[in-house]
Amino acid sequence: MAMATPTTNGSFLLGSGLDCGSSDVARMQGVLARVRGPFTPTQWMELEHQALIYKHIVANAPVPAGLLLPIRRSLHPPVFPHFSSGGILGSSSLGWGSFQLGYSGSADSEPGRCRRTDGKKWRCSRDAVVDQKYCERHINRGRHRSRKHVEGQSSHAAKATVPAIAQPPIGASNGKLSGSHGVSNELTKTLATNRMMLDKANLIERSQDYTNQQHNILQNNTKGDNWSEEMSSQADYAVIPAGSLMNTPQSANLNPIPQQQRCKQSLFGKGIQHDDIQLSISIPVDNSDLPTNYNKAQMDHVVGGSSNGGNNTRASWIPGSWEASIGGPLGEFFTNTSSASDDKGKSRHPPSLNLLADGHTTSPQLQSPTGVLQMTSFSSVPSSTVSSPAGSLCNGLLTSGLVNAQTVQTL
């Protein structure tokens, strides 16, 4: 095949848009004339084109756009499919990736600018985020705002601060502001969490205090109920410990308080105004009903107490043999009726319950086995005084202790 003449090649180069001088063309033609071996005319033209681009690169001069456009057109996929699929010129490592080789229709005239447009002529003037198409303002425009969470905003702001460093100063300032906003959000969340923890701790302490108060109130109420039940159960079996009467939770040791004064007035009437009214009771208990290991002193133990706590003397008319005998009421009545007892008997037997004063001798004393001092001016106990624990105690003791003297004498 005959090669094209130099004039033809020169005219082709000039027609192709290459601005070259006559001297350069003549020199290139001389070079091509010497090296005309196995190259085709198309290959020679491509070689000349690349030689001109090389000269601009060596001279540190900007390459004109007219020299680059033919290369981009020549790399179209239908013509050179192997280049567009990752060939030598198609790789982005050689610097051709920014021109989107093989896609002339999708070329971006301003690669670093945000691509948000109104579909016609307007385009966003901000710089796009690195490796993104849009700026920070338009990067989330397509998402549903109603489904965005508060945590997502802070996390996205924290992520946006990292690429904003490589942007111009305006973008960098925006990134710093968004980062400070995210830090402030984290601080407010931490403060809110601490406040919630303190409120929970205060609520728990208040609930514990309220529970302890309710528990103490219930314990006090149960103590009073247990004491009244113990008094009623022990009065039925005639075995009442002296300590339970002396140390009652409601001060039932016959102290001069209004509650006990009401009990005395209900028992003996309003006409008697004695402050030291006492009653001595000695209740015998059958020994056969008690267990064998039951102490004799506990079997003969009788309740004792006085208004001042120091007057624990027993009545002079009660014989010591009555308390120590084990023959029952008839044995006590027929064995010994003496009215005096020695000091050993006084120290051996515990004091008896004194509800009437020792000096009160206006009413007759009955020599009965039970030793009940009955007054002639006895009045009935109204129901209002029995409602209290002290009133019920006085009523139970008198009703269980009063015995008709004539019935005892007939025995």
UniProtKB/Swiss-Prot annotation:
GO BP, sorted A to Z: developmental process; DNA-templated transcription; regulation of DNA-templated transcription
Protein localization: Nucleus
Keywords tagged on the record: Activator, Nucleus, Transcription, Transcription regulation
Ranges for region Disordered: 333-369
Domain QLQ: 38-73
Keyword check for Ribonucleoprotein: no
GO cellular-component term (any): nucleus
Motif residue range(s): Bipartite nuclear localization signal: 113-123, 141-148
GO MF: ATP binding
Compositionally biased residues, Polar residues: 360-369
Classification via InterPro entries: Gln-Leu-Gln_QLQ, GRF, WRC_dom
Database matches in Pfam families: QLQ (PF08880), WRC (PF08879)
Residues in WRC domain copies: 108-152
Domain note: The QLQ domain and WRC domain may be involved in protein-protein interaction and DNA-binding, respectively.
Family: Belongs to the GRF family.
Known role: Transcription activator that plays a regulatory role in gibberellin-induced stem elongation.
PANTHER family: GROWTH-REGULATING FACTOR 5, GROWTH-REGULATING FACTOR 7
Protein name: Growth-regulating factor 7
Lineage: Eukaryota, Viridiplantae, Streptophyta, Embryophyta, Tracheophyta
Gene name of the record: GRF7
